[in-house]
């Protein structure tokens, strides 16, 4: 009973954004947090870097460059998603089109928010990220915990609980529903 789209293998276009300490306010500025739904935040992702003061695209911002248009894998620096615990940051990146984020490290809360929103956060050393950033596309194999370029494969760690959720397309509600009969049995015993 999948509630989110399962992630097993994924091949996609990359965009490098090698800044360290990108916080949730840089990912989605608080001025844009006026919605209660998870959608509609994509146009505001990286708002202050993505657009010039006149509202036009900033040509120096990597995701705006023609060679990176349509990228679904973000390769970034250390301590990604630090700052406040706003889940809107994960919503904005997902709505923008990212499915995988590869960083040197993540804020714990941001990491959890990614997995809860069917995005795979991957931690890799800087040398691996720099290698992968040379290619237009890379491939992720979640069951085997690898990220591959055409000439090299890197292993990554992920907690088995998060891996199981993502591979099987399970959100928290779907996991709870797996125990529905036990819950009903307990309720009847009260």
Curated annotation (Swiss-Prot):
The keyword Amino-acid biosynthesis belongs to this UniProt entry's keyword annotation: yes
A GO cellular component entry from the record: 3-isopropylmalate dehydratase complex
Uppermost EC category: lyase
Record function comment: Catalyzes the isomerization between 2-isopropylmalate and 3-isopropylmalate, via the formation of 2-isopropylmaleate.
Keywords linked to the UniProt accession: Amino-acid biosynthesis, Branched-chain amino acid biosynthesis, Leucine biosynthesis, Lyase
Domain of life: Bacteria
EC numbers on record: 4.2.1.33
Protein name: 3-isopropylmalate dehydratase small subunit
Pfam families, sorted: Aconitase_C
Listed PANTHER family: 3-ISOPROPYLMALATE DEHYDRATASE SMALL SUBUNIT (PTHR43345:SF5), 3-ISOPROPYLMALATE DEHYDRATASE SMALL SUBUNIT 2-RELATED-RELATED (PTHR43345)
Biological process terms in GO annotation: L-leucine biosynthetic process
Reactions listed under catalytic activity: (2R,3S)-3-isopropylmalate = (2S)-2-isopropylmalate
Pathway in which the depicted protein is active: Amino-acid biosynthesis; L-leucine biosynthesis; L-leucine from 3-methyl-2-oxobutanoate: step 2/4
The gene coding this protein: leuD
Family: Belongs to the LeuD family. LeuD type 1 subfamily.
Species the sequence originates in: Staphylococcus aureus (strain JH9)
GO MF, one annotated term: 3-isopropylmalate dehydratase activity
HAMAP family: LeuD_type1 (MF_01031)
DNA-binding keyword on record: no
InterPro entries: 3-IsopropMal_deHydase_ssu, Aconitase/3IPM_dehydase_swvl, AconitaseA/IPMdHydase_ssu_swvl, IPMI_Swivel, LeuD
Assembly and oligomerization: Heterodimer of LeuC and LeuD.
């Amino acid at each position: 009973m999948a509630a989110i789209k399962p992630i097993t293998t994924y091949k996609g276009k990359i965009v490098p954004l090698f800044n360290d300490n990108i916080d949730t306010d840089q990912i989605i500025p608080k001025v844009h947090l006026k919605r209660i739904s998870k959608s509609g935040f994509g146009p505001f992702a990286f708002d202050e870097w993505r657009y010039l003061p006149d509202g036009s695209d900033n040509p120096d911002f990597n995701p705006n460059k023609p060679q990176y248009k349509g990228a679904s894998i973000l390769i970034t620096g250390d301590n990604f998603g630090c700052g406040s615990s706003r889940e809107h940051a994960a919503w904005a990146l997902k709505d923008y089109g990212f499915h995988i984020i590869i960083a040197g490290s993540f804020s714990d809360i941001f990491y959890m928010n990614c997995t809860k929103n069917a995005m795979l956060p991957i931690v890799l050393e800087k040398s691996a990220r720099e290698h992968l950033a040379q290619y237009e596309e890379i491939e992720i194999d979640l069951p085997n915990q690898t990220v591959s370029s055409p000439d090299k494969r890197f292993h990554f760690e992920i907690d088995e609980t998060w891996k199981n959720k993502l591979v099987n397309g399970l959100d928290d509600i779907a996991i709870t529903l797996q125990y529905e009969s036990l819950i009903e049995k307990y309720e009847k015993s009260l």
